[in-house]
Each structure stands twice: as C-alpha cells, then as structure tokens.
Regions:
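Helicase P-loop NTPase motor core
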Residues: 22, 26-34, 96, 102, ...
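P-loop NTPase Walker
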Residues: 1-103, 107, 176, 199-200, ...
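Proline-centered turn/helix-capping motifs that create local helix->coil transitions or kinks
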Residues: 141-147, 288-298, 426-431
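Conserved nucleotide-binding/hydrolysis micro-motifs of P-loop NTPases
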Residues: 28, 58-61, 85-88, 139, ...
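ATPase/helicase motor core of nucleic-acid motors
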Residues: 87, 262-263, 305-309, 332-456
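Coupling/switch/interface segments within P-loop NTPase motor domains and analogous charged loops
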Residues: 109-177
Length: 456
C-alpha cells in the first residue's frame, strides 16, 4: 500500500497517534500522502466512516475521492471526503434544530445575499456599495464575529453602520430559514462550542481528520478543527506557508503558528522533493520566495534533471506579450519531430481579464485553445431560475427563491406589488409565499397585482 512513497511521505503516512503537520511544497505529492494515509488508517483497523478528509474546492474533493478509490476500492465511498462547507452543511442539517433551523433550510448564493443586504439597508443603496458591505460582513463572519461583536469592535461610523445592517441581514436569514456560505462554517462552530452533546457526537464520530491546503484556513475554520478533534488531536494538516495567498478573504498564517502551541506533541514532516518541475524551475522559484518570512524553512529539490533555463522576456504591451507567447509555442512545435500536441502547452495569467489578448493572438494564428474557468454552469441565469423553483418547493419560507421564481417568466408583477407583499409579510411575521394564502391579503394589495400573484 505504501509502495512508491519517499521516506518523508512514509513518515507522514505512518504517524497516526497524534497531531501531524505535513509541510508540503508545491508538487511534492501531498494528495498522494493524504490518500495513502486514509488507506493506512483503514489498514490498521479504523472504520472508513470515522475518517474525514477536508479540502477547499469540490474539484479537489472529487479528485481526492477518485484517487482514494484507486487505493481502497469501494471503501472510499464511506470516507467523508468533502469541503469545509460541505461538512458544515451536513452538521447543520443533522443538528441545526438546536439553533432553530429546519433540516430543509436554504443556502443562499452571492446574488441572494446581495439582494437581502440591499433590502436590510432600506433598498436604496447602489450595487457597488452593497457589494462592499457584503464583503465586509463576509470578512467579519470569517473572523468569527457576529453582528453584536462587529458593532462593539467597529472602528468608525461606517463600520458601525455596516454592523447594524448585518444585524438586520441576520434577522432576515433567520426568518427565511436560510443561511449564507459563511454560515456553513460559523454555525457548525457554534454547534460545537455551545452544545456539548453535539460536540461529543462529532468527536466520537470522527477518529481522524485530514485537512488539505491548511495554509488557506481562516480563524473560524481553525477553531472548528480544534473542536472536531478535541483533546485527542488525531488530525493531519497538510499545507505550505509559501503558498498562502488568501489573506484578503480571511486566511491567516497564524493558524500554522498556533498548531505547536495548541498541540505540543505536534509531529512536523517536510515534503521537499518536487515531482513536477525541473531543477532550473525550482531554483528560480526558490530565489523568488527566498526573502519571504519563514515559519518552517524548507528548500525544494528535484531529481528530474536541470531542464530548460527559465526565460524572462520584456514586452512593450499586452498585445506584444501575447504575440511573443504564441510565437514561442509555434517555434517549439516547429523544432520538434513529431511536433507536440497543442494541449501540451499552457499560458498562465494572473487574472481572468488578462486572457483576452492571448485569445486574440491564438485565434489569429489559428491555434485551438481552451480557457479554463469562466462562468460556472450553476451561475447561468436559467439554471439559477430552475434552482430557485426547487428551493421554494423544498422550503416555502425561502423568500429570495420566491422573488426569483415569481419573476420568471414575466407575469406583470412589478417591484411595487412585491414591496406591498413584502410589507404585508413583515407585518404579519410570515414568508412571502405563505402571505399569498392569507385571507387578509386582498385588502392590502391592488386587485390586478393580487390576481397576478395568485396566478403564480
């Protein structure tokens, strides 16, 4: 089961008696270590259902699940391999009743949150300001602050105003039986922190927790991990301080600093052999990150040979840069016999808006290409419309889903009619959908608006 692992990887896999931090440099086989450790735990007799492997994206979780399946076969389906937020959904659906949430609660997307925050602010705020408030509220939640705590810590009038809006926003979420993305971490943390019976349940359920991309965890995720593993501290955190790039959304390297303090028996294993790049590339990368402050110093090395030297090219403009890149690709293909396939080349850029010049240059050269990323299938308007209908079917208190459903397709129901319905629902402390069935509604709405709503 451990064939093909180097000595450092074997050390990380075989240490199962306490807390373990695996410092995994880029391309050092961290996913391999995680999946082999899952297999090793099962080999030693642990129930697959007692193992949780947590990562940050659904794509990474799917890849990990597939690689675990290759190692342990059908047992992989019993291992909890998921994102932090997927774990949060499961915890709140199972135990959220103590927080006043039904198991059928709705999970709001970014657009829903934006609309509710605008409504909480009085409905007259411009979109850009509402987005800024949304970002601030999200950051506060990632720091573990509720509205009252945010108000107490506010530095100025602007932050105090946002904290007040946050309180109204939270009231609306509660009324709608809905949660946002950040709640999927903060609510499980509240469950574990405030309800001993829930904490005992999850600590007894999970015998070992593995966390991928640990350097990207924020304060609430760290606290959640601590409460999940309890005093036994049976966990494996896999990360790299040199790859921490999400500080702007709450990720903190303090979580790496805290581990040796909170878990004095922490075993630290460094994975320094890179299996992806040549020595020339690694030397350049080591020189770039060399001046960075180091929590745990390490130096990556490769046994793939020296390789081609790294070239740095000065360009006059974005268009010139794109043309040079395309010319380089064409030159490399022309020099090889047989020429490599187009899919053997990649162009990396920092942000999506930088793709356009490269796309134009590739089109001019008649080179086939594929842009990774872009709009998610679930972000398409028609898919959001369909999902809103399903959400409303499952949870009739989901006001954001109602507002999207009632407007698609168009039924002649305007903003004023919906505002009147909203006022009626607020006055009678009910959801928008439930308000449609109130015998008092006809007296509150114009006949035409009422007919359109009842037709819905």
């Amino acid at each position: 089961m451990s064939a093909g692992l180097n000595l450092a990887q074997l050390q990380a896999v075989h240490y199962t008696n306490g807390p373990c931090l695996v410092l995994a440099g880029a391309g050092s086989g961290k996913t391999r270590v995680i999946t082999h450790k899952i297999a090793h735990l099962i080999e030693r007799g642990m129930d697959p259902k007692a193992i949780a492997a947590i990562t940050f994206t659904n794509k990474a979780a799917a890849e990990m699940r597939e690689r675990a399946k290759q190692l342990i076969g059908r047992q992989a389906k019993n291992v909890l391999i998921c994102t932090f937020h997927s774990l949060g959904v499961r915890m709140v659906r199972e135990d959220g009743k103590v927080l006043g949430l039904k198991p059928q609660f709705s999970i709001l997307d970014s657009d829903d949150v934006h609309s509710i925050i605008k409504d909480a602010a009085g409905g007259t705020t411009d979109a850009a300001t509402a987005r800024q408030w949304q970002w601030t509220i999200s950051l506060w939640k990632n720091m573990g602050l509720n509205a009252q705590e945010a108000l107490a810590q506010a530095k100025d009038d602007n932050e105090r105003s946002i904290a007040v809006i946050m309180a109204r926003y939270e009231e609306r979420l509660s009324a709608y039986q809905s949660v946002d993305f950040d709640d999927l971490i903060s609510l499980p943390l509240k469950l574990l922190r405030d309800f001993p019976e829930v904490r005992a349940k999850w600590q007894n359920l999970l015998g070992h927790v593995l966390v991928d991309e640990y350097q990207d965890t924020n304060a609430t995720q760290y606290d959640l991990l601590k409460l999940l593993v309890g005093e036994r501290g049976h966990f494996t955190a896999v990360g790299d301080d040199d790859q921490s790039i999400y500080g702007w959304r709450g990720a903190t390297l303090d979580n790496l600093k805290k581990l040796p303090l909170d878990f004095p028996t922490l075993q630290v294993v460094k994975l320094e052999q890179n299996y992806r790049s040549t020595s020339a590339i690694l030397r350049a990368a080591n020189n770039v990150i060399g001046p960075n402050p180091k929590l745990f110093p390490k130096t990556l090395f490769s046994e793939l040979g020296e390789g081609e030297p790294v070239r740095v090219v000065d360009c006059d403009s974005e268009e010139h840069e794109a043309d040079r890149a395309v010319a380089r690709i064409q030159g490399l293909r022309a020099a090889a016999n047989p020429p490599p396939e187009w899919r053997g080349f990649a162009i990396l850029y920092r942000a999506n808006h930088m793709a356009k010049p490269f796309e134009k240059a590739l089109r001019r050269a008649s080179i086939p290409y594929k842009v990774s990323g872009g709009t998610s299938f679930f972000d398409r308007a028609e898919i959001k419309d369909l999902c809103a209908w399903f959400r409303l079917w499952i949870n009739s208190n989901d006001d954001p889903a109602f507002l999207r459903s009632v407007g698609t397709p168009k039924r002649g129901i305007g903003h004023q009619s919906l505002a009147q319905l909203g006022g009626f629902a607020t006055q009678h402390k009910t959801s928008l959908f439930a308000a449609l069935f109130s015998p008092m509604l006809p007296a509150a709405l114009p006949r035409r608006a009422l007919d359109s709503l009842l037709e819905f």
